[in-house]
Structure formats: C-alpha cells, structure tokens
Amino acid sequence: MEGLRRGLSRWKRYHIKVHLADEALLLPLTVRPRDTLSDLRAQLVGQGVSSWKRAFYYNARRLDDHQTVRDARLQDGSVLLLVSDPSEAQRLTPAIPALWEAEASRSLESRSSRPAWPTW
C-alpha cells in the first residue's frame, strides 16, 4: 500500500503562489510534493524572476532550499513569501491571508478576516 501511495504522489500537483514582496507580485506555480525549494527557484527563473539572495517563508518560518514541498508542509493553495530582508518577512506575514482572500474573491481590495464590529 505504501508503494502505491508513493507512486501516486509522483502525479500529484499543487497549485501554489509565491508573493514577491519587493515587486508586489503574486506568481502562480505548479509543484509536486517531491520538488525542492531549489526547483521552485528554477521555475521562478524560468518566469524571469531572480530569487538570488532571497529567502522563502511559509507560516512565518524560513524554508531551506533542500526542503521538499512535502517537508515544508505546503498544500494546494499555499502562499510562499519571497523576501530579501528577514525583517520584511515578519512585517508582511499577517498580510498574506488578506491578499489570498482578496484574490479568491477577485476583489481589488484586500479585506481582513476580522469582523468590523466587536463580537461579544
């Protein structure tokens, strides 16, 4: 059964997005669970984006280039942050869900998931 599961993971694809904080871009990528972050960098270079001296962040933690998509626990719809300055990652991490939410609803404005009034 484990061999079948491993064989099927070869065909599994995740549609993720990479948020380039320096250029204010959100790029879609299609990845496999066994792809490494270095493979993601290669895809970005293929799209004309340099990732030199930049770090990937996911859920406020830095990812290493040798990690696979599975090791980083990325899922379909995940958003990675690619920044050159680590302090910028801490500042921008709370904005990622709002950006994703805005794109999902095709709205031009990002919305907060918090209610506008107090809920007591």
Swiss-Prot record:
PROSITE patterns named among the record's database cross-references: UBIQUITIN_2
Protein name (Swiss-Prot/TrEMBL): Ubiquitin domain-containing protein TINCR
InterPro entries: Ubiquitin-like_dom, Ubiquitin-like_domsf
Coiled coil: none
Domain Ubiquitin-like: 14-83
Signal peptide feature range: none
Tissue localization of expression: Detected in stratum corneum (at protein level).
Cystines in this chain: none
